[in-house]
Regions:
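Small-residue (primarily alanine) positions within well-ordered alpha-helices
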Residues: 27, 45-46, 75, 79
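Short beta-strand scaffold segments in enzyme catalytic cores
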Residues: 40-49, 125
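N-terminal charge/polar-biased segments
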Residues: 2-5, 150-152
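Zn2+-dependent cytidine deaminase-like catalytic core
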Residues: 56-150
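Short, compositionally biased leader-like segments
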Residues: 3-25, 129
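Short glycine/proline-enriched turns and hinge-like loops at secondary-structure junctions
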Residues: 38-40, 69
Length: 152
């Protein structure tokens, strides 16, 4: 379990440049933990909870492909299994053979998982380096998303 508890409360609206830089650095450092022997495309994600807790995740591939999991879902599932339900942001990076050369966006399945647990203004930070990132909201990357309220 890779979790750090902090006292400060953070939301998507109060996220600071320093916090973003910290998430970017952790994402870049965590890429070495990816298990991608088939695609050789390594991905790392760092999820920031509203209470300041941080959960990491990596893509974990499987020879049968279907059981593989993306880094973003890995981080979310770790957090949710630890009773977290309030999320502020996620930073992610990825690259062939673990070398980050460009921005890496979440796949559609990961966007849908984020939609299950996050507000439309949830921040998704695509990391290229500690100083180069792009920030999107969930509603920008998944407009008109289907969520729990659609089933009420």
């Amino acid at each position: 379990r890779n979790m750090e508890k902090k006292q400060a409360v953070v939301t998507s609206d109060t996220l600071t440049k320093e916090q973003i830089r910290e998430l970017a650095a952790k994402s870049l450092a965590g890429i070495k933990n990816s298990y991608a022997p088939y695609s050789h495309f390594h991905v790392s994600a760092v999820l920031l909870c509203g209470n300041g807790a941080v959960y990491t995740g990596n893509n974990i591939e499987n020879a049968a492909y279907t059981p593989s999991v993306c880094a973003e879902r890995c981080a979310f599932f770790k957090a949710v299994s630890e009773e977290e339900r309030d999320f502020a942001a996620i930073a992610l990076c990825g690259g062939l053979k673990g070398v980050v050369k460009d921005y890496c966006a979440p796949c559609g399945v990961c966007r849908q998982v984020m939609r299950e647990f996050c507000k439309p203004d949830f921040k998704i930070i695509l990391v290229k380096s500690e100083e180069e990132w792009k920030i999107y909201t969930l509603s920008q990357l998944l407009p008109e998303g289907f969520g729990p309220e659609n089933l009420e």
